[in-house]
Amino acid sequence: RHFFTMAEVKRMIDTMSLFKLNRLHLHLTDGPGWRLEIKKYPLLTAMSAWRVPLASGEWNWQEVKLAIQENDPEATYGGFYTQEQMKEIIAYARSRRVTVVPEIELPGHAYAAMHAYGELVCDGVNFPVEGKKGRDTVCMGRPETLRFVKDVVDELKTIFPPGSPIHLGHDEVSTESWRNCKYCQSRLKELNENSLKALGRDFLQQVASYVLSLIHI
């Protein structure tokens, strides 16, 4: 939700090393922002890494306004790590015996990804209005969704060392968007299932299978 600079992350790693903590979980994506360069999807960082600064006061997610275009002059708060910067963080952490664990939040908490790439949004969802009211879950029926996730995983594989864990989030997944989405309902019929939760299970299984297929034993 809030971007931490390279210097701040390194200072955290130094503190972790001092107290013999050996895993740094980086929450790189969430509704209010996407923080890692993905070369195949440049709008993730050109748009969804930046937002209009909020007025001082209590944090309110529904007031967040992400950049509506590249170089949006009003969206000046935020930032992201280039792939080279992330490699630098990983090397810095490794030299202090700390493992960096990247988290890419899916299928829920995906407002930032959906904001940049509308093909991830379910049919019938009034985005972005409903996206800030719990309908921030990517579509389970569109083929673009699985392709997107696989592409992101492919790039993570080039950044992180072999055998590095990848966290896929999968928390607080709202199924409401899937209920009236023609693509999700079509996928549900293919699975011969009635429960919307089956879509989430199927998605996670497909992603996990893909990640495992990349492991060379």
Report residues per predicted region.
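Alpha-helical packing segments of well-folded alpha/beta enzyme cores
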Residues: 8, 12, 85, 89, ...
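Conserved, mostly hydrophobic/aromatic
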Residues: 16, 100, 168, 211
